[in-house]
Design a protein with these regions (language model features):
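Compositionally biased terminal segments of proteins
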Residues: 1-199
Length: 199
């Protein structure tokens, strides 16, 4: 079992996420801890520090009403300003997800007392990118592999297991998986040839 990877907590986006979670805690007037499972580009950013995203994909352990005006103004490292917000349309059922993805998520203390944040494993983030497989999804998979956070074999095995519970176009999904594994193997080759290495 791979050791938990380090998180990049000092980037502008990571600090913006912390502020957004504080807003959520205050607006919901939480009296007991709320589990929040982080997916998507923001989760990738916490692992890689290279992905820039403004919408936060999150799944909640309880039914919550997300105020539509929860927004944090973030000044990125290059000086540009972005608005960070929860994607209220995010739905994990549209992605390819292994049945254990929530149980295997990694706890991350953001210093917000009533928010229990869990970040999806790099492996599950990579698998979740396969159904859509847009350009940014491909980049995310490659970067996670280049950093040694997951492997082509792990992605292939986890995604194949996840397909058992997937409802949708399996032929296209299998094609996407084939391409994702090929992409991951290419990223492994780049890593082996002297690319990025894990801290």
């Amino acid at each position: 079992m791979r050791a938990p990877p380090p998180f990049h907590m000092h980037t502008a986006l990571a600090q913006g996420l912390k502020a957004l979670l504080r807003q959520l805690e205050e607006r919901l007037a939480l009296q007991s801890p709320l589990k929040v499972f982080l997916a998507g580009g923001m989760a990738v950013h916490l692992y890689t520090a290279s992905r820039v995203t403004t919408d936060v994909d999150a799944e909640f352990g309880s039914r919550v009403f997300l105020p539509g005006d929860l927004v944090v103004d973030v000044r990125l490292e290059d000086g540009t300003r972005e608005l960070l917000y929860f994607d209220t349309n995010y739905n994990a059922t549209f992605a390819l997800m292994h049945e254990d993805y929530l149980d295997d998520a990694i706890a991350l203390d953001m210093g917000v007392p009533q928010i229990r944040l869990y970040v999806l494993l790099p492996l599950d983030l990579a698998v979740s990118k396969i159904a859509r497989f847009a350009d940014n999804d491909k980049e995310d998979i490659a970067e996670l592999v280049r950093l040694g956070l997951t492997t082509a074999n792990e992605i292939e095995q986890r995604a194949t297991q996840a397909m058992a519970g997937y409802v949708g176009g399996l032929p296209m999904l299998r094609l996407n998986l084939r391409d994702a594994v090929a992409l991951a193997r290419q990223a492994e080759a780049e890593r082996g040839a002297g690319g990025n290495s894990r801290a």
